[in-house]
Amino acid sequence: MWLLNDLFASTPVHSGERLSVVAMQQLGEIGARAKDLFERNRKLLNEFLDTREELEAVRPEFGTVMFPRVRSGDSEELCRVLREKYETSVVPGKFFEMPAHFRVGIAGETAVLEEGLERLGKALDEISRG
């Protein structure tokens, strides 16, 4: 009896190739969904930034990440509080030789970003209280 592994072991990317064909056939729909998602999430993050005086950011029109700066000068404490107390991850700016910044992505589902921004707000409030 043949196993799927016997059939696909010599070409392990077969399933990936099949999925890529399906995706290419629906590229317009996929692109439209992605554009809508990025625009909605970018607007959400920009609105959040408008309410947070302790952050500033260049607000690009395109892309899937933003790189806000913590005005106090160090994002390390913010990243630690987010990770330890709120189980939320952002990428510390130290990895980009910009320790006052942190990287946040907007390519995920909007509900996840909303929850993440709520947690980010709580962490910022906690840090500002001392």
Segments predicted by a language model, with ranges:
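PLP-dependent enzyme catalytic core of the Aspartate aminotransferase-like
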Residues: E77-V90, F96-G130
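Conserved core segment of the aminotransferase class I/II
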Residues: M1-E39, F48
